[in-house]
């Protein structure tokens, strides 16, 4: 049987059919939206991607996508009823891993320098989610991650821009406590990548700033290094003084690239 986006849509609707959920199919974009009838919150599933997974894993691919959608929608419903939002926050890898002895935080690896934690935000205060709080919330770690990333994508962004020696720097500083969190918004990163002509360099020196730079020369690398160090030193919640080159969805710390460059230069001289 040849699988198509339309057939995949039918398979997913069959798996996810519940009286409290609605389905909308955009045949032009090949996207299936599953949302809660009451809140209209939901998830968009790009069907060509699922079809590609099906070509390799067959039924398992459908089961996997259906499971993640179901987990995320259930978690959203619980979050809505609790009156608090769950959002990811970026922290240094040196940040404590436990709230107290025997009670670890819920965490996800991010880069060599950063780690993702999860915050329960009730507008006035927020608390990092640890295992005990997770049990009280009656959520799984996967539900927390899905919900947090969904909420991160809904955070607005408006950059200030500055150009120095041909290099363009974009600054996000809303002071909502989640500026660095925007680094997890893939669609934001991709849209910036499309407008950048040189190397795309990203920095989160502290939690209240995100810097994205279009670096076209060595001066640009010097400027971003100095800038990141300055912001890191001034930050209320410092994260990392290193910046990263962003390419193909991956973050590479600049000092690693510099080391590799030196090794290459050394070989050429030899």
UniProtKB/Swiss-Prot annotation:
Transmembrane segments: none annotated. This is UPF0354 protein BC_4690. InterPro entries: DUF1444 (IPR010838). Belongs to the UPF0354 family. It comes from the Bacteria. Coiled coil: none annotated. Pfam families: DUF1444. It comes from Bacillus cereus (strain ATCC 14579 / DSM 31 / CCUG 7414 / JCM 2152 / NBRC 15305 / NCIMB 9373 / NCTC 2599 / NRRL B-3711).
